[in-house]
Amino acid sequence: MTILDKHPEKNLIRLQLSQNIVLQSLDQSSMTELESSLEISDLKKSEILLRQGSYQMEQYFVLDGILKRIVSSADAKEMILRFAIEKDIETSYAAWRLQRSAPYSIASVTKARVARMPLKKWAEFLDAHPKLKESFEFEVMRLMSEIMAHTITLHM
């Protein structure tokens, strides 16, 4: 029995996971396998999931609400890099793979719900599911490209 099996809204959460941009291609047995590593977190508005500079990183699947990715300067100026909504992912996968600290923070903008798991476990799951790994890494690159384009536009 997984943590999700005990959740009072397990059916809704399973539906939301199946609609996630990265997870929607998983078959039922793979989704069940993934569920055993997931933790469901209900977040308050402005709750920090990941602090810039941290090495403790997780993979997030946004089930409900809005998250933001923000970077802070030494003089406490903040810039929002992106928002993630229901069906999106939020991750620091590239930093984790490079064994670097998180270059940004992730926080909830609204009350939100996420499914989360340590990036080490997520990477192991991806290694066992090559097609998923390919689509996930493509999504990470797409997001990074969008953020780069947005940042360049802001500074022109």
Please place each PLM-identified region on the residue numbering.
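Alpha-helix N-cap and coil->helix boundary residues
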Residues: 26-29, 79, 135
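Hydrophobic residues at beta-strand termini and immediately following loops
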Residues: 41-43, 84, 117
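Polybasic "coupling" helices that flank or enter modular domains
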Residues: 107-156
